[in-house]
């Protein structure tokens, strides 16, 4: 956290904030203060974006490049397993190995998502 003190404006960190951990919802396990306020208190430029949105992430990195005198942290508010009917928002995927049937469904979900973007 000393990067803010030293004004390391060539440093960019990214926090994957999916609100899940191996044992469940992070808020159920331990109350989380505002990530944004915490980083800002240490002198960081804070950008909070929808982390599953590539355009938003690219834009955040562009903004970070132009921030002078402070390091930047991007809080990427993500959905774990986004786009997969099998995995989305399920904490057990921190450690679970998919079955062949689950892999098939995951690939189908991703193919459908890819087609929708075309």
Describe every region a protein language model picked out.
Residues 1-118:
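Glycine-rich ThDP/TPP pyrophosphate-binding loop and its adjacent helix/strand module
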């Amino acid at each position: 956290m000393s990067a803010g003190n030293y004004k390391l404006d060539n440093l960019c960190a990214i926090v994957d904030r999916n609100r899940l951990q191996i044992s469940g919802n992070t808020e159920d396990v331990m109350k989380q203060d505002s990530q944004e306020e915490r980083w800002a208190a240490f002198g960081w430029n804070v950008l909070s974006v929808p982390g599953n949105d590539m355009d938003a992430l690219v834009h955040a990195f562009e903004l970070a490049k132009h921030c002078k005198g402070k390091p930047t942290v991007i809080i990427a508010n993500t959905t774990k397993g986004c786009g997969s009917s099998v995995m989305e928002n399920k904490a057990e995927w921190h450690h679970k190995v998919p079955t062949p049937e689950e892999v098939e469904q995951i690939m189908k979900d991703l193919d459908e998502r890819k087609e929708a973007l075309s």
